[in-house]
């Protein structure tokens, strides 16, 4: 392994570890999910824009159709984050993370209709395994019933997964050479679309944060979004798609570990089996696709 490849792997792993801590940070930020999503998009896009100019780059003029599609995917990202943050609020980080990682399964099931791709036997088995895993993770089989809060959290998590699936599908229709420019537009759109939503649903004048919360928000916007996106997209040309797909599963595994160690939200035996089925099926389907 040469030095450049080693640096790329280090950047990729670092970005996955950063993404894996997002649920923990969300627990300590006393903002509504919509407000946090807005700040994430705003700070993340600002950071990447500054990074592009510092590196001597400039934004290219894009076709109006491309900008429109990027704005739509960005808007979907904004509401996707909002639902994911709500999932973290209502259920454990572990369960919310597993719900969110149903996204590859949703894409697999939609692929025959959207991309005219054949649903192979391997992909079908992966989808069925993930759905069974979701049943295990949900707590239905624990015998104690599911709390209303957990049901809401699961639904928010699955909703976030569905929106992210839409982002993945639409992204395939958008061709932009500069991944930073693509991310800047999407992150900015995510923030902009949430402004009218917040004005209609919240009294933002009553929002107040202490010093710790402000630092947490800055970390989510700059580190979890700006820096993590820069690390992730900065290595895409240097590593094989399959390598990136494999390493991307550091994120949910690390999130599960942190949930257990820091928040003491360990999965039940059924939950652990479900997590293995969901992550395993997503992993196999990604490897097959790449």
Which residues are covered by each model-predicted region?
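Juxtamembrane C-cap of transmembrane helices in multi-pass membrane transport proteins
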Residues: 17-31, 36, 43, 82-91, ...
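Transmembrane alpha-helices of multi-pass small-molecule transport proteins
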Residues: 31-79, 104-107, 163-167, 184-202, ...
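Specific alpha-helical transmembrane segments that line the substrate/conduction pathway
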Residues: 35-38, 42-46, 85-118, 160, ...
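Helix-helix packing/entry segments at the starts of transmembrane helices
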Residues: 39, 96-102, 170-191, 225-261
């Amino acid at each position: 392994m040469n030095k450049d490849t080693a640096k790329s792997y280090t950047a990729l792993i670092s970005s996955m570890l950063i993404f894996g801590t997002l649920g923990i940070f969300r627990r300590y930020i006393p903002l509504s999910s919509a407000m946090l999503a807005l700040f994430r998009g705003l700070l993340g896009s600002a950071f990447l824009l500054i990074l592009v100019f510092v590196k001597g780059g400039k934004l290219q003029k894009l076709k109006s159709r491309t900008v429109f599609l990027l704005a739509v995917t960005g808007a979907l990202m904004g509401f996707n984050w909002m639902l994911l943050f709500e999932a973290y609020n209502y259920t454990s980080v572990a369960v919310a993370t597993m719900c969110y990682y149903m996204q590859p399964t949703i894409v697999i099931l939609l692929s025959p209709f959207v991309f005219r791709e054949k649903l192979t036997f391997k992909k079908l088995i992966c989808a069925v395994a993930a759905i069974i895993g979701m049943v295990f993770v949900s707590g239905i089989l624990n015998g104690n019933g599911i709390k209303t809060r957990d049901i809401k959290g699961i639904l928010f998590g699955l909703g976030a997964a569905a929106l992210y699936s839409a982002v993945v599908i639409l992204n395939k229709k958008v061709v932009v050479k500069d991944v930073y420019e693509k991310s800047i537009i999407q992150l900015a759109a995510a923030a902009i679309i949430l402004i009218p939503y917040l004005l209609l649903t919240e009294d933002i004048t009553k929002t107040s944060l202490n010093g710790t919360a402000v630092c947490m928000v800055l970390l989510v916007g700059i580190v979890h979004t700006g820096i993590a996106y820069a690390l992730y997209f900065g290595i895409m040309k240097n590593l094989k798609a399959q390598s990136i797909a494999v390493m991307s599963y550091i994120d949910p595994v690390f999130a599960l570990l942190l949930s257990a160690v820091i928040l003491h939200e360990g999965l039940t035996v059924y939950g652990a089996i479900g997590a293995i089925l969901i992550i395993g099926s997503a992993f196999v389907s990604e490897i097959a696709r790449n």
